[in-house]
């Protein structure tokens, strides 16, 4: 009951400061982010949940694409409208601090860290969307390729081959 009251108060505060029309239903979020449905990387819009001290304590998935569902290893229909902590009991607070900064201070941030919730190394770029929300682009960091790293390996092979041919 207390959590529901906090949520309603939060929505009222956000509505007062918001000049942008906030989507109110899952359908409105789907329509707004339709272009993101087919992205080849995970994307989500999350609504932050704050306590009385205005500290982030959780977030609610308001939109997500199928790539997000695959990365998070959860069905999309189970995620949308659910809080992160209700889906993952081993929630790590490090994500909250980054998303809170993007939401409250309008910062675009990047975090690369291990996610114990899904046992995956992640690269996440988050940015403000609607008041009280942030968007997140997520990548499995172990599946990403670094051009500079590949170029470095090519140079090492070239040097090695050059050294071997001169012997």
Cite the ranges covered by each PLM segment:
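PAS/PAC sensory module
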Residues: 42, 108-114, 120-125
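Terminal output helix/cap of sensory domains in signal transduction proteins
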Residues: 87-114
């Amino acid at each position: 009951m207390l959590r529901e009251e906090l949520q309603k108060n939060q929505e009222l505060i956000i509505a007062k400061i918001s000049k942008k029309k906030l989507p109110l239903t899952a359908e409105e979020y789907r329509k707004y982010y339709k272009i993101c449905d087919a992205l080849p990387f995970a994307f989500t819009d999350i609504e932050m949940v704050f306590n009385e001290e205005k500290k982030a304590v959780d977030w609610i998935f308001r939109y997500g694409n199928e790539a997000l569902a695959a990365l998070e290893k959860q069905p999309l229909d189970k995620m949308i409208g659910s809080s992160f902590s209700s889906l993952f009991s081993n929630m790590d607070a490090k994500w909250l601090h980054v998303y809170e900064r993007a939401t409250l201070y309008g910062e675009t941030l990047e975090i690369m860290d291990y996610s114990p919730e899904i046992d995956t190394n992640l690269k996440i770029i988050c940015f403000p969307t609607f008041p009280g929300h942030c968007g997140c682009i997520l990548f499995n960091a172990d599946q990403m390729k670094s051009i500079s790293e590949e170029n470095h390996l090519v140079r090492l092979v070239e040097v090695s081959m050059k050294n071997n041919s001169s012997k």
